[in-house]
Amino acid sequence: MAFSPQALLPYVVLFVAAVGGWKVYSSGSKKVLKPNEFQEFELEEKTVLSHNTAIYRFKLPRKTDILGLPIGQHISLGATIEGQPKEVVRSYTPISSDEDKGHFDLLIKSYPTGNISKYVANLKVGEKMRVKGPKGAMVYTPNMVRHFGMISGGTGITPMLQVVKAIIRGRGQGDTTEVDLIFANVNPEDILLKEDLDALAAKDPKFRVHYVLNNPPEGWTGGVGFVTADMIKEKLPAPASDVKILVCGPPPMVAAMKKATESLGYAKAKPVSKLEDQVFCF
């Protein structure tokens, strides 16, 4: 039987198509998070913001990989720490999103009694952190409400920033959600990511940020003291079926905000928040 090169043509086409398809698949974005299994990610970069706060960038396996974290959810960090009987696990919300490929960023403030925060602060570039997720009841979807009111304190800004960025990114696809954010801190230098927040507010008229300080500098025009029911009434949307209040901050602040929002007519915040709650506490 004579050999015909044309007879191999269909197989060549199939092979090329298969290889091409594999290349497209292999070069695409892959979600790396596993909800029930810790994985190790290498610290790639550390950006110090203050004496006790930094942004930690962790490397994903490939430059095209994404974390795979729904907007509004968080991850768990785990570490075996001397003196602790079992692995210590704490939750953090990245300030990056799946728009950022090849890495994820965590804003972490170290506390004297914070086991995980101190552990991360002592990590050197090249060392690894155990991570799993996603976790959490909050998942943002475009136009899920007409208006968000947000109340945050300190590093409680992280889930708020994640949601705000997603809303503003979605403007071109029809996301019309309004956002008013009350961000409370002790001193001016404690206002984390202020430049980012101000830039977002300048860019988008439907996002407004209201700063509150315990120790304001001379000439300060923002709020002063603790966040009160009067501040919430003045700055945030009134109770309505298409309004949701998000709260994240130190436990005493969260407890106070639950009482304040209830006094203003919002639905009573539950001990453990669910997505459908009018007042959702991270």
UniProtKB/Swiss-Prot annotation:
GO cellular component term of the entry, any: mitochondrial outer membrane
Alphabetized PROSITE patterns for the sequence: FAD_FR
Predominant cellular place of this UniProt entry's protein: mitochondrion
Reaction it catalyzes: 2 Fe(III)-[cytochrome b5] + NADH = 2 Fe(II)-[cytochrome b5] + NAD(+) + H(+); 2 Fe(3+)-[Dph3] + NADH = 2 Fe(2+)-[Dph3] + NAD(+) + H(+)
Membrane topology recorded in Swiss-Prot or TrEMBL: Single-pass membrane protein
Reported cofactor(s): FAD
Record's keyword terms, sorted: FAD, Flavoprotein, Membrane, Mitochondrion, Mitochondrion outer membrane, NAD, Oxidoreductase, Transferase, Transmembrane, Transmembrane helix
Protein name: NADH-cytochrome b5 reductase 1
Organism (species): Phaeosphaeria nodorum (strain SN15 / ATCC MYA-4574 / FGSC 10173) (Glume blotch fungus)
Gene: CBR1
